[in-house]
Curated annotation (Swiss-Prot):
One of its GO terms (biological process) is xylem and phloem pattern formation. Homodimers and heterodimers. Interacts with the auxin response factor ARF5. Interacts (via domain I) with TPL (via the LisH domain). The lineage of its organism: Eukaryota, Viridiplantae, Streptophyta, Embryophyta, Tracheophyta. Aux/IAA proteins are short-lived transcriptional factors that function as repressors of early auxin response genes at low auxin concentrations. Repression is thought to result from the interaction with auxin response factors (ARFs), proteins that bind to the auxin-responsive promoter element (AuxRE). Formation of heterodimers with ARF proteins may alter their ability to modulate early auxin response genes expression. Gene3D superfamilies: Phosphatidylinositol 3-kinase Catalytic Subunit, Chain A, domain 1. Residues 55-70 have a biased composition (Polar residues). This is Auxin-responsive protein IAA12. GO terms for molecular function: DNA-binding transcription factor activity; identical protein binding; transcription cis-regulatory region binding.
Amino acid sequence: MRGVSELEVGKSNLPAESELELGLGLSLGGGAWKERGRILTAKDFPSVGSKRSAESSSHQGASPPRSSQVVGWPPIGLHRMNSLVNNQAMKAARAEEGDGEKKVVKNDELKDVSMKVNPKVQGLGFVKVNMDGVGIGRKVDMRAHSSYENLAQTLEEMFFGMTGTTCREKVKPLRLLDGSSDFVLTYEDKEGDWMLVGDVPWRMFINSVKRLRIMGTSEASGLAPRRQEQKDRQRNNPV
């Protein structure tokens, strides 16, 4: 009986001891539990807070360099964009200068051409040409010739190269100026006088010629005694 009573007494004392321990644990560990259940703030981590504040202040104080900025798509550095714009501007300026030089050269060339074909400078342009024995006259552009020889060649091809005429048999090529043909080349000046072609300088001739005529030497003998004398000397002194 004694053993049973001690066991019962021991069992009855267990809840009281456990409650005592639980109460002591809550009373002793209450402060620690409150600390563990509280929400942490930046004040609990002073080192981290100072680091973030330092980084934010550094980012706000120093702005990135302008050369690192990107423009457009695909991204292009601002300094490269500026260089491209400057290059384009320089190319445009050079192109304008080149166009200006070309225009100046072209204007000079046009002036030269106008001086060459200007009738006031280089004669009257087209003049009428007649030949004895040929009823149809022709016209020749005086501005297209640079010498008496060129003019004589053109006229000989016009008239003596025609088929069905007797003149082709009488006149040899390039004989209108040397006095060895039965025909000579004459012209009428602005004053209405007939003269032999070749007695005056070429520029004076083209500025004064009004029309041309290929006439026989018999009719032209009174126009150019010098040419007739030259012809007589050639006959007397054959080469």
